[in-house]
Amino acid sequence: MKMEELVREIERLKEERNAIIMAHNYQLPEIQDIADFLGDSLELARKAVNVDADVIVFVGVDFMAETAKILNPEKTVLLPTRRATCAMANMLKVEHILKAKEQYPDAPVVLYVNTTAETKAYADVTVTSANAVRIVEKLDSDVIIFGPDKNLASYVAKMTGKKVIPVPEYGHCYVHRQFTLEDVERARKLYPNAKLMVHPECEPEVQERADIIVSTGGMIRRAPEHDEWVVFTEREMVYRLQRLYPDIKFHPAKEDAICIGMKAITLNHIYESLRDMKYEVEVPEDIAEKARRAIERMLEMS
């Protein structure tokens, strides 16, 4: 089936199923073009609370679809392929949290939304890269257990002055970890008039040389501050920014900064998922109830 026909069929099925397509900023351009709502993790979580549809087709990785289901237990949530997983989310296990709580029993557990539903059930509050600093600042504790991204944990510690215990100690996003000081130097030489926008999942030494450190939603909000940027995050964010601001120049810091989990979903997967109503996301209610409290607390504190 040609792309134009595939898009028409997806639109037809959306109407027939009363469905909405929610997609993350890292999705393929052709998916961004058909999404009803595009955003970062925080924006998608907020949107999921007020979705006016019977079916949510979540075009992101599995933990995002789980979050949508947790916030919409009565709706059908579809993840178009089971291969859309997040390696970092799977690094954090319940045992890591319990071990940290033994050592720091009074410390609140703050978990990145990039975690499984099972681990979210042990969180006092969840955060995204967009609101992590603000939420940790509001917590009445100088010691925080934070997982799973060690680089975001380091950034939060630096910005808040609090003691942040990373769980696990090796948690990271492989896409953002690959950005190096050499990439910073190359960007400065290639684009001398550009500023560098860097995601807080990047290594601390890369963050230190950034002009701004922001989530993907923050990149969108702050892009108009300058006329040329080098973007240190997943490659497809450049497409999103360029669509929004055609008069501003955006360059990917690395052409091969690709999230395999995000790229696992194609238009054909979306079509087949809607056609057959397959790959429905389910979260056991006992886990969902506990995780929901942590997510809703995040939304209240944001």
Curated annotation (Swiss-Prot):
Entry-linked InterPro entries: NadA, NadA_sf, Quinolinate_synth_type2
Transcription is among the record's keywords: no
GO molecular function, one term: 4 iron, 4 sulfur cluster binding
Positions of iminosuccinate binding: 24, 41, 112-114, 129, 199-201, 216
EC number: 2.5.1.72
Catalyzed reactions per annotation: iminosuccinate + dihydroxyacetone phosphate = quinolinate + phosphate + 2 H2O + H(+)
SUPFAM superfamilies: NadA-like
Cofactor(s) needed by this chain: [4Fe-4S] cluster
Keywords annotated in UniProt: 4Fe-4S, Cytoplasm, Iron, Iron-sulfur, Metal-binding, Pyridine nucleotide biosynthesis, Transferase
Pathway this chain belongs to: Cofactor biosynthesis; NAD(+) biosynthesis; quinolinate from iminoaspartate: step 1/1
Cellular location(s): Cytoplasm
Cofactor note: Binds 1 [4Fe-4S] cluster per subunit.
Name of the protein described by the UniProt record: Quinolinate synthase
